[in-house]
Amino acid sequence: MKASIAARLAQLADRLEEVTHLLASETATQDMEAFKKLTREHAELTPVVETFSAYRQCEGDIAAAEDMLADPEMKEFAQAEIAEGKDKLEALDLELQKLLLPKDPNDDKNIFLEIRAGTGGDEAALFAADLLRMYTRYAERNRWQVEIVSASESDLGGYKEVIVRLVGQGAYSRLKFESGGHRVQRVPATETQGRIHTSACTVAVMAEADEIAEVVLNPADLRIDTFRASGAGGQHINKTDSAVRITHIPTGIVAECQDGRSQHANKASAMQVLAARIYDIQLREKNQKEAAERKSLIGSGDRSERIRTYNYPQGRITDHRINLTLYKLDYVMDGDLAELTDALIAEQQAELLAALGD
């Protein structure tokens, strides 16, 4: 291990001890914001320090085994211990490198998840509903809260477009690689000849913006229109101009909401979505530049890129960015996304580690 990395890890161990002491203080909960920050820092530092402790213990075990090499009776045992210890040390070193990789500041944020039906008409809209169910079930597995912000339903019960807010720890970190084109191959319910059709949807995952720190919206740059809501909401909504559309004039970005029970609620939701869209554009520009610099296959956030194919006749799902194919489509569509998300996160970590080595 490099001396600079060992010194950094020793500093983190000292900091964990300090944070633990602060959290145990009688005055710790007097400032709840500071208490929450310390709790988060403690949770982030603990796995790093524990792994570093295991690394140092392993180094000590190897040194003890090397001392036994001079004893003829213990030599064979010592050699086996050293070989096993070095393998373990290498694995711990790699784990520490991953733990020390720069954290995405958005990883712990809530997200807005937007699904738009693309080519394929009614079948694409039905697939959009299937994707929404998949992400909703995944959110439930993670005990995240799901809120529908805006929905435009199709005639057959699908969605032309739907936006949901997912609230929960690590929502962005787990789903940020879902942005892009999702293609489905299956026999539609409306198909009488049994032919397989190909349809597509576009998914956009946007981190919820911190309105104060990350996106400043000048009221002079906004055009706010109200109109009659359609669809869900009942007669009351249809009789009043409760739906809200907000346009950010400098960029032309639009956000609208009509699913709330009042114009005030819809305006607040539309402002949140607008801020998230503007923040998302800023992030994508930054990510695309960084991805191009390290020739990244994932994480660029290119919405036009086809990232995944769902083949129903074969029960197959393929992620084209990492050439991963799973024959467990039913499980994935029921929200079992862990294998996919874990593989994508691992690929990004490998890319970042390779970049550090350059």
Curated annotation (Swiss-Prot):
GO terms for cellular component: cytoplasm. It is found in: Cytoplasm. Methylated by PrmC. Methylation increases the termination efficiency of RF1. SMART domains: PCRF. Its main location: cytoplasm. Signal peptide: none annotated. One of its GO terms (molecular function) is translation release factor activity, codon specific. Transmembrane segments: none annotated. SUPFAM superfamilies: Release factor. Gene3D superfamilies: 3.30.160.20, 3.30.70.1660, 6.10.140.1950. The modification N5-methylglutamine is found at Q235. Keywords: Cytoplasm, Methylation, Protein biosynthesis. Coiled coil: none annotated. Peptide chain release factor 1 directs the termination of translation in response to the peptide chain termination codons UAG and UAA. Belongs to the prokaryotic/mitochondrial release factor family. This is Peptide chain release factor 1. It comes from Chromobacterium violaceum (strain ATCC 12472 / DSM 30191 / JCM 1249 / CCUG 213 / NBRC 12614 / NCIMB 9131 / NCTC 9757 / MK).
